[in-house]
Amino acid sequence: MNAVDLIVEDDAWSSLAGKTRLVEEAISAACKELPDRTPGVVAILLGGDEGVASMNAQFRGKAGATNVLSFPAGEHADNHLGDIALAHGVIQREAEDRDIALADHLRHLIIHGFLHLQGFDHQQDDEAEVMEAIERRALARLGVADPYPNEDPGPGPHSE
């Protein structure tokens, strides 16, 4: 499994019990779906909308907060795979809008961010299908419902 460095920057996350375990289990589930993954330490920032909005503007040139940002460390990072930043307010609103638990939505977005650190993307439909299939399998390992219930699961790499 990849090691996790969890940083809780926003007090809004204090109401979520078992954060460390949740984060580690999400990364572990993703790792089980990626036998050829790149090892290394993943830093996960549980932040607020304002901080993530600032990063989104600075690094992507986009205004406003987004749910998750991934920052791959690159080739010369000595065991640091990259960083994942998550915005509490955005994630909370999305979970409420979708009528799902905050913890389950967070698990999904951690797995999603980790896949970006592993080189996966979803710019093209075929890439999105592969990425979503891995997300579905990793979440199923955690007992989390399919986050894409109205979409065809599409093909994906098999872990067994």
From Swiss-Prot:
Cofactor(s), by name: Zn(2+)
Q: Where in the cell is it found?
A: Cytoplasm
The UniProt annotation places Zn(2+) binding at H112, H116, H122
Give the EC number(s) listed in the UniProt record. 3.1.-.-
Record keywords: Cytoplasm, Endonuclease, Hydrolase, Metal-binding, Nuclease, Ribosome biogenesis, rRNA processing, Zinc
UniProt cofactor note: Binds 1 zinc ion.
Q: Which SUPFAM superfamilies match?
A: Metalloproteases ('zincins'), catalytic domain
Report the record's Gene Ontology biological process terms: rRNA processing
Which GO MF terms are attached to this record? metalloendopeptidase activity; RNA endonuclease activity; zinc ion binding
Q: What is its main location?
A: cytoplasm
Q: What does this protein do?
A: Single strand-specific metallo-endoribonuclease involved in late-stage 70S ribosome quality control and in maturation of the 3' terminus of the 16S rRNA.
Alphabetized PANTHER family for the sequence = ENDORIBONUCLEASE YBEY, CHLOROPLASTIC
Q: Which protein, by its recorded name, is this?
A: Endoribonuclease YbeY
Name its species.
Maricaulis maris (strain MCS10)
